[in-house]
UniProtKB/Swiss-Prot annotation:
It comes from the Viruses. Keywords: Glycoprotein, Signal. This is Uncharacterized protein ORF15. It comes from Ostreid herpesvirus 1 (isolate France) (OsHV-1). Residues 1-18 form the signal peptide. Glycans are attached at residue 64. The lineage of its organism: Viruses, Duplodnaviria, Heunggongvirae, Peploviricota, Herviviricetes.
Amino acid sequence: MTMYIGLILVVLATFCQGEVVRECTFKAYLNDYLSDRTYGLLPCRYFEHGVLPKETLVVDISPNDTQGLWDECGKSDEYPCRFRDKLYWKKAYYWREKHGRSPHVPYPYCDDNEGVKPCYYYNKLMRFDQSRSVNFRSDHVWPVCDDINTDFIDEMPKPCQYNNRLYWGAKQYRMHTGKTRKPPRITNIFIRRRQGINGRLSTKPRRFKQWNLN
């Protein structure tokens, strides 16, 4: 009788393999069950046997995962994106779940969990927490520091560049640049140079309301 029960359990385990995720461990993520790079690595086990099918795009993770093992989001197919205790292999699926629509051009180094890096979304940089300093990528140009005269972080939708760093807050920007006074507003020279790119010249100072990185 015991043998029959064991056989039934083995059959059930084989049949249900990969359909239920019981745990998602860092060890399994690094060392076990590598899949096709098209789908990235498969981090989750089904008990001690088998893995999720490689076509899986959404992976449940353990609610007890409190060690922050999934903070690396979207660097490549090796790093899934975490949102509400789920892992998304494709950033398009991740963005669709989080923002209701897929990104036009996803920023390649977007870390929403820690907020230390900006997110490139629809030709704009967006942040999702109160982080004031982020790493700067030299292949992008940051010509405008919007709302630089305000000290309120929530009114700083665009970061300021200084010495290959980006700063969200005006206070942080002034502290790192050594400036004791508030930086001046955008000058007419900058306006003429900016508008001259598009064939328009003007000496009327104005503030840019939209920031396009393209």
